């Protein structure tokens, strides 16, 4: 309950019952902590701290930690460490001020940008078209974000903040614009009421999002307006280049002007709130990066634009940066962050000196290793780095970290390095948004258009050979997946000795969506992991229930929604580890490789995959026919599923038997190449490349 008296009463009861030394925390989003702890003992106040999470807490990394002047600093650090290690959060230290860091800065940005749009005639689609990934913000951009959060929540937070900060020089900017209040009165609150700035509808069997007319408050079909400057900015390259381009274009282009006239006030406001809400720039930046999914917070964004040039631009527009920013520039310091002797420093508005950025001892930065000369080899798609202590790291950095010929090439280079006496193991990991979205379809389409099936066959064999080499190499291989880990990316993991997965890892063998089957050993691994173990344990066990599960996971392209679900699907084993903080993956995987290296013995080559034979295959195929009769599967779905059934059961084997892994790999390759010759597979591949969505034909 976000009311002071009930919280005080609760804290009195907590003090009476809590064991000695227990940390006591409240997750208030705005009530001052010192008010909640008023009347409690000094001992209570020393172990009392605020913890504020951002919704949805599963996906947003931010945890604001709010000590009072009485809180023991060791308690603060313990809570921060617990949040980072156990909960997978990023902890920032906020002062006990209204709305702390994220909602103080975020409310200003949200209300100011909405007001500017309304007062200057910008359409909802226009604003969302230029305030998303183009400027380093999430796809929800501005108005879709309001719909997601709920307009009543956004307006309520702004109104409460307005009342709580009478001394804020920008207080009037915190007031919700009248348009938002009118929308609230009309119950246009966003997703929770079914309509807000957007309204979800269905027309001609397709989901559409109609857009609100801010004059009539009626929804109309989306117009998808052309924004030429957005396209031009996108072509500039990275975030710094895109933002610099837009700021430079602002005087002549209204869309670029919107970016400038909302971005600069937001950065200036953030500077004026330091050190009121936080003593460090990194905590303010992290609050916006982790709580609002911004690529860079206000001060890192300012560095991208050039601090001195941006302050001059602000002054010409009548925007006031904090006095400490001007003092920093006058002292000859031109950036908020800089690196000296391998250590990243941040300017402190309190000490007026550069101080080290807080480092997470569990975080390994691959870019820093590269800067330190630890890169052993590199090409356009992958690199091989030295993690120290005899452990190497194979890093993917192709588009989407998709598996291509250059990744295979670098994988083979990693195998060569593993032959060295001073190398004890290999980690396969990266710091991209996703571990790997699967095979490089563009590379495959290029070969198809040239009629070069031989090249595709060579590529399939090369991938199979590499992954089998990872599986049997006499030194441990540990994969560290996170995010989407699909198709060939998952097959890389399945052939590792151990997987150290982020909690938010989404694994699946999804090849049927493009009219193919897993051909890098994925189908074989499902037979080995799901079907074979129960038959090893009890030879008379009926294999069909286990075959059915493996078959459905592949034929229906099932994807795990978390690492825990991936364990249920046998993508992860009981020996694999789940790490809640993705920043700790490389470090944890390295430790795992070192642990395995001590007395490591590779798996034996053996007839270790159970092939159930033709009778089991017929049972699986009958299940497909049933789905087709019920119109749950197309005719071509049945063709693909038939190949999956054939591989899982061992092809044309008349009787059940144990076979080597290579036997199923050969079946995979033949099925894959056969499907590649089919026009309907070509249609599925082209549809996915064009629309980003799988096609059913």
At which residue positions do the language-model features occur?
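N-terminal glycine-rich phosphate-binding loop for ADP-containing cofactors
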Residues: 1-433, 442-462, 466-475, 482-486, ...
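Short glycine/serine-rich donor-binding loops of glycosyltransferases
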Residues: 490
């Amino acid at each position: 309950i976000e009311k002071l008296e009930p919280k005080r009463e609760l804290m009195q009861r907590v003090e009476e019952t809590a064991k000695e030394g227990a940390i006591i925390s409240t997750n208030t989003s705005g009530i001052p902590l010192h008010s909640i702890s008023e009347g409690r003992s000094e001992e209570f106040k020393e172990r009392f701290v605020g913890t504020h999470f951002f919704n949805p807490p599963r996906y947003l990394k931010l945890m604001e930690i709010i000590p009072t002047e009485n809180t023991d600093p060791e308690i603060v650090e313990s809570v921060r460490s617990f949040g980072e290690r156990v909960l997978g959060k990023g902890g920032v230290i906020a002062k006990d001020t209204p709305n702390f860091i994220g909602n103080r800065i975020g409310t200003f940005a949200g209300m100011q940008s909405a007001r500017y749009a309304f007062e200057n005639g910008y359409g909802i689609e226009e604003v969302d078209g230029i305030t998303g990934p183009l400027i380093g913000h999430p796809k929800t951009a501005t108005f879709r974000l309001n719909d997601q959060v709920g307009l009543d929540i956004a307006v309520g937070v702004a109104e409460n903040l307005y009342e709580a900060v009478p001394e804020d020089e920008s207080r009037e900017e915190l007031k919700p614009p009248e348009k938002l209040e009118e929308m609230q009165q009309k119950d246009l609150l966003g997703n929770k009421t079914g309509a807000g700035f957007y309204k979800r509808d269905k027309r001609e069997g397709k989901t559409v999002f109609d857009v609100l007319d801010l004059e009539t408050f009626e929804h109309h079909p989306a117009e998808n307006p052309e924004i030429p400057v957005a396209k031009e900015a996108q072509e500039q390259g990275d975030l710094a280049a895109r933002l610099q381009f837009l700021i430079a274009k602002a005087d002549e282009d209204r869309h670029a002007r919107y970016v400038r006239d909302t971005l600069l006030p937001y950065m200036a406001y953030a500077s004026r709130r330091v050190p009121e809400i936080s003593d460090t720039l990194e905590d303010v930046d992290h609050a916006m990066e982790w709580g609002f999914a911004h690529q860079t917070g206000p001060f890192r964004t300012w560095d991208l634009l050039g601090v001195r040039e941006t302050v001059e631009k602000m002054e010409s527009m009548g925007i006031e940066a904090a006095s400490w920013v001007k003092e920093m520039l006058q002292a000859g310091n031109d950036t908020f962050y800089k690196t000296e002797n391998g250590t990243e420093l941040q300017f402190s508005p309190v000490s007026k000196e550069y101080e080290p950025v807080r480092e997470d001892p569990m975080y390994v930065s691959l870019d820093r290793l590269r800067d330190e000369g630890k890169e052993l080899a590199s090409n356009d798609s992958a690199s091989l780095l030295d993690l120290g202590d005899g452990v190497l790291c194979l890093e993917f950095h192709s588009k989407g970290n998709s598996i291509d010929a250059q990744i295979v090439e670098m994988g083979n280079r990693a195998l060569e390095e593993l032959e060295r006496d001073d190398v004890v193991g290999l980690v396969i990991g990266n710091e991209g948004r996703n571990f790997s979205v699967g095979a490089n379809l563009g590379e495959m389409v290029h070969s198809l258009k040239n009629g070069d099936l031989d090249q595709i066959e060579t590529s399939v064999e090369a991938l199979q050979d590499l992954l089998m080499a990872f599986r049997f190499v006499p030194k441990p291989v540990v994969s560290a997946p996170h995010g989407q880990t699909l198709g060939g990316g998952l097959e890389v993991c399945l052939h590792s000795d151990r997987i150290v997965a982020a909690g938010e890892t989404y694994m699946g063998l999804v090849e049927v969506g493009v009219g193919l089957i897993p051909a890098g050993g994925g189908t074989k691994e499902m037979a080995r992991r799901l079907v074979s173990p129960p038959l090893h344990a009890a030879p008379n066990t009926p294999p069909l229930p286990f075959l059915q599960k493996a078959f459905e996971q592949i034929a229906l392209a099932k994807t795990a929604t978390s690492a825990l679900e991936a364990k249920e699907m046998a993508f992860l084993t009981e020996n694999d580890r789940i790490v809640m903080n993705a920043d700790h993956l490389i470090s944890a995987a390295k430790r795992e490789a070192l642990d395995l290296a001590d007395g490591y013995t590779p798996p034996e080559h053996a007839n270790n995959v159970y092939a159930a034979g033709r009778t089991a295959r017929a049972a699986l195929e009958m299940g497909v026919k049933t789905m087709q009769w019920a119109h749950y599967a197309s005719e071509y779905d049945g063709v693909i599923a038939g190949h999956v059934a054939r591989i899982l059961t061992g092809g044309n084997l008349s009787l059940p038997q144990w076979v080597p892994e290579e036997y199923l790999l050969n079946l995979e390759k033949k099925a894959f190449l056969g499907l590649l010759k089919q026009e309907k597979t070509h249609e599925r591949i082209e549809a996915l490349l064009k629309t980003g969505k799988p096609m059913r034909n």
